[in-house]
Amino acid sequence: VALKDVVATLTPRVQATVLRGMLALPEPVQRRLVGKPVVRDGQTLATDVQLSLWLQKLAKEPGAETLPMEEGRAALRRHAAAAGGRQPIGSVRDLTVADLPARLYVPTGAPATGPLLVFFHGGGFMHGDLESHDAACRFLAERSGVRIVAVDYRLAPEAQFPAAYDDACAAYRWVVANAASLGGDPARLAVGGDSAGGTLSAGVALVAAREGLPLAFQLLVYPASDGVRRTSSAELFSEGFYLTRAYMELANDSYMPAGGDFTDPRYSPLYADIPAGVAPAFVATAGFDPLRDEGEAYARKLAEAGVRVELKRYPGLIHGFLNIVGVGRSSKAAVAELAAKLKAALGG
């Protein structure tokens, strides 16, 4: 019986156990399993990432874009739970922020008042919630010593553009006004998120500068910034590396109303005018990510406008690495570095 046939018959829970076991193997053993390295655009795919993609292919998992919306959302939650693991944290409590569901993560040993990150999850504006990014938020908070409040903004297609943007801005304004109730120091507030959440975070940072709201730092993890142009990385990596062209097209069609303007800076921050006083940024991109080039273009735009920016490409990783801290060594190391950057910026 071929291995691919065995893997395809396993339940998702057992597949996750197999994945964790194989990703715990020494790198040379993983390399023998997956064969020669994948090299593209002068970059080599991390061995554990290559193994993960290989196992997903064997499992014949349908892409989220092929499923009915609610099934796709459930699949993301399921996969994130399997890949993120149960990360330790001092305490967690659910609350409401600007009439939106939210979750506060307080790291072990946190002082009564300290730095606070407002986090917006990824998922193409149509998937993702507090559960899908629970492990990532736990990991970031505990490793950085920074409180995190994750916000569950409205999703498309039920709530189309600019609903998510409006929710993100409202949530940040609420946090500024109520920081003390969360244990947040108003002088050490940050905003951050991954993918679509990175887009929202970039938008909030611009609003904060225009409105004079306190914001000390922005953490943008493989953000989408340009809904118009097709970049080189989008051509190179939109098949076979987790985030597909079909998924991105569905996300665009779900979130943006028919006839909408994809150059609207609330959707594509690359087209925004950068005001004075924008918070310093750390922009993380993945080498094998279709969104790589537009994320890096936004980092350059900020820098050209005088914003203090650090850009870091993780050349061997793929889109979504924030969600696999429980199984992937290379992804876990990258997210640990994100936590260190957050700690350094805010003094966690």
Across the structure, where does each feature detected by a protein language model lie?
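Active-site glycine-rich loops that stabilize anionic/oxyanionic intermediates
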Residues: 121-127, 288
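Short beta-strand-to-loop junctions in surface cap/lid or active-site-entrance loops
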Residues: 102-113, 270-275
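Short amphipathic alpha-helix adjacent to the substrate-entry channel of hydrolases
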Residues: 131-150
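A glycine/proline-hinged amphipathic helix-loop "lid/cap" segment
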Residues: 1-104, 347-348
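Gly/Ser-rich "nucleophile elbow"/oxyanion-hole loop immediately N-terminal to the catalytic nucleophile
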Residues: 176-191
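Glycine-rich nucleophile elbow surrounding the catalytic serine of serine-hydrolase chemistry
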Residues: 193-203
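Short beta-strand element of the alpha/beta-hydrolase
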Residues: 113-122
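Alpha/beta hydrolase fold serine-hydrolase catalytic domain that processes acyl esters and thioesters
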Residues: 2, 186-187, 202-348
